[in-house]
Every structure is written in structure tokens, then in C-alpha cells.
Amino acid sequence: MAGSLNEIKSKIASTKKTSQITGAMQMVSASKLAKSEQLAQSFQIYASKVRQITTDLLRGELMASDTSNPMLIRRPVQKSGYIVITSDSGLKGSYNSSILKAVMGMIEQDHDSKDEYEIIAIGSMGADFFRARGINPVFELRGLADNPSFEEVQKIISKSVEMYKNELFDELYVCYNHHVNSLTSQVRVQQMLPVEDLDHNEADGYTATFELEPNREVILEQLLTQYAESTIYGAILDAKTAENAAGMTAMQTATDNAKNVINDLTIQYNRARQAAITQEITEIVAGASALE
């Protein structure tokens, strides 16, 4: 009986240590979440302004004639590009599995062979997932900070836009978990290129005029590139916010489960201890009766 009590006591102690670890990780994730939410919200001010300027230009008189900018032209789709954003580690609940499942489902539905798409992987979990299935990402980024600056992701963003311009693929999507709140995220697949949701035909009668230097083509090239890059970066910040929220929720769940286990083990320990005491009393009474 003593051995059983010691075993239960040992389990309680180890579970308490686990609870302390997951509780600390929950607090760290909560701090990361607050910072990533603030960064994402701040960047949206800039991204919205870039979108507004781009929309105004595309709706203005400078778009009265056809444009040859490749970022606005829909080509016959022979190959698609997917930027897939995941985390670099586990302990994120269903954060990684949900987006990877959605991407694989889309690939299986829309493509007949690996020659019809390219994967650009942000995050080790996604990169390793695709490599394990014989799909080698054309470009990948690992070890991204919890609150990445634009400089940290500029290379992979610029490379993605460059590959589209060079016709390595004919359309580009970004696939990630959109942060709704601390408990909820939604899988989002957003078309980045070609730029279609800023069609100048949306606003007939728009009369804005612009004076552009050095010329229309140069301004469009720079602005559309900046728009695409800022949109992709915004998606990365959104995904990082969802990742931190998922990590916080997962650690909170683990902490709560550990506390439940501790409570169950404590009840089990008390019952075993009570049984041991009762047995000892019974043995003492029996011994005393035998001496009479």
C-alpha cells in the first residue's frame, strides 16, 4: 500500500511541474499575442493607404488605355503558386493541421500533377510536411520571429513576386490562418496575383486625374509591387497572430487538463491513504482482540 501511495504522490508532483511549465508557456504566448495583434493592427493602417492609392490610380484616367503590366494581366493558367504559412514548431493545437489539410485538398482538387503548381513554404512545419510527400518547395523560410519585421520576410516576398513576373507560375495565392480572436482562426486562401480585385471598371464615372513622374508605367510597376508585397506581409502578420493565439489556447488547455489530473490523483491518493489507515486500525484492533 505504501508503494502505491508513493507512486500516486510521484505522479502528482510530476504533473504539477508539467502544469507550471504549460502555465508559463501560456503566459509567454499571451504576451506574444498582444504584441503581434498590435503590430498587425498598426501595419493595416499602412496597407489600407497603399490599397487606397492603388485603387484610386487604377480607377483614374491613367487606366483609360490598356496596360501591359504583368501584375494586372490574367494569363492562361498553366501553373499556380501557393505561399503556405505555418509555424516552425508544434504545440499549436490544430493551427498547422487545418491549413495544411485545406491546401492539400485544394491541390488534389485543382491539379492533376506536381508540374501544375509550386509551393513557397513559410515555416518548418509546412516545409517538412510537403517534403515528406515528395513536394519540394521552390522557396522556403524557416525560423521566422514571432513578430517579424518586413526586412525579415522581404526576400521571400520579393522572390514570390519576381517568380510571378518571370512566369514561373501564372497566379499566386497565399494560404494561412486568419486571426479572428484568441479562440478562433479561419483558413484563408487569398489570390495575390494577378491583381484583380482593384479592377478600374468597378467605378464607372470616377473622374480623378493624376500627374505622375517620371511616367505612368514606372509608377504602376512600383506601386503594384508595393501593394502585392504589403498584402503578403499583412497575411504573414495575420498568420503569426493566429499562431500565437493558438499556442496560448493550447497551453491553457494543457494547464487545465493538468489541474484536472492533479485533482483526480489527489482524490485517488486520499482514498488510498484512508484505506491504508483503516487497514492499520483494523489490524491493531484484531491484534488487541487476539491478546484478550
Curated annotation (Swiss-Prot):
Gene3D superfamilies: 3.40.1380.10, ATP synthase, gamma subunit, helix hairpin domain (1.10.287.80). It is found in: Cell membrane. Keywords: ATP synthesis, Cell membrane, CF(1), Hydrogen ion transport, Ion transport, Membrane, Transport. GO terms for biological process: proton motive force-driven plasma membrane ATP synthesis. It comes from the Bacteria. One of its GO terms (cellular component) is proton-transporting ATP synthase complex. Disulfide bonds: none annotated. The keyword Cell membrane applies. Pfam families: ATP-synt. Signal peptide: none annotated. One of its GO terms (molecular function) is proton-transporting ATP synthase activity, rotational mechanism. It is a peripheral membrane protein. Belongs to the ATPase gamma chain family. Produces ATP from ADP in the presence of a proton gradient across the membrane. The gamma chain is believed to be important in regulating ATPase activity and the flow of protons through the CF(0) complex. NCBIfam families: ATPsyn_F1gamma, PRK05621.2-1. F-type ATPases have 2 components, CF(1) - the catalytic core - and CF(0) - the membrane proton channel. CF(1) has five subunits: alpha(3), beta(3), gamma(1), delta(1), epsilon(1). CF(0) has three main subunits: a, b and c. This is ATP synthase gamma chain. It comes from Streptococcus suis (strain 05ZYH33).
